[in-house]
Curated annotation (Swiss-Prot):
Residues 35-101 are annotated as: Disordered. It comes from Dictyostelium discoideum. Residues 1-159 form the sHSP domain. Keywords: Stress response. This is Small heat shock protein hspM. PROSITE patterns: SHSP (PS01031). InterPro entries: A-crystallin/Hsp20_dom (IPR002068), HSP20-like_chaperone (IPR008978), HspG1-11-like (IPR051779). Belongs to the small heat shock protein (HSP20) family. Residues 36-46, 61-95 have a biased composition (Low complexity). Pfam families: HSP20.
Length: 159
């Protein structure tokens, strides 16, 4: 039995097409990128195949920072000696907190159309193509093909 494994992480099973043309195994597909991890319906193809910098909002940290800023503003308003300095400090704190709320990361995943080819000609005569089977689980495509039962020995009679 021949077992072929291909890593296709991040690809949906329905977006994979497998064919054998002559003695060439062709695997084609489309890898999509979700614009927002919470919204899986918003998909986009990026044909650049380059790392990207993406922004991600974190609601829990921004709300806790806003609560801290409100507490700082209340403390500043209670202190009557340095109102001008405290207002400047609270404005600076608001600017700093809005900058720290933005999270950016680099994504090194490629997206878009892909094609993989495998030349089966060295073993093609050994393959029983009626038994070919493909499974896709956890980003791993496994193709299995049984060997033929035909022997390679052929006796030829002389006429």
């Amino acid at each position: 039995m021949f077992v072929l494994n291909f890593e296709l992480a991040g690809v949906n099973k329905n977006d994979i097409k497998i064919e054998i043309k002559d003695s060439l195994l062709c695997i084609q597909g489309e890898k999509y990128k979700s614009m927002n991890n919470n919204n899986k319906n918003n998909l986009q193809i990026n044909n650049d195949d380059k790392p990207m910098i993406e922004e991600e909002d974190d609601d829990s940290s921004s709300s806790s920072n806003n609560n801290n800023n409100n507490n700082n503003n209340n403390n500043n308003n209670n202190n009557n000696n340095n109102n001008n300095n405290n207002n400047n400090n609270s404005n600076n704190n608001n600017n700093k907190s809005s900058k720290t709320n933005d999270k950016k990361f680099i994504s090194e995943r490629s997206f878009g159309h892909f094609e993989k080819y495998l030349d089966l000609s060295p073993v093609f005569y050994q393959l029983d193509l009626s038994t070919i089977n493909a499974q896709f689980e956890d980003g791993l495509l496994t193709i299995t093909v049984r060997k033929t039962n035909l022997s390679n020995n052929i006796k030829i009679q002389i006429n």
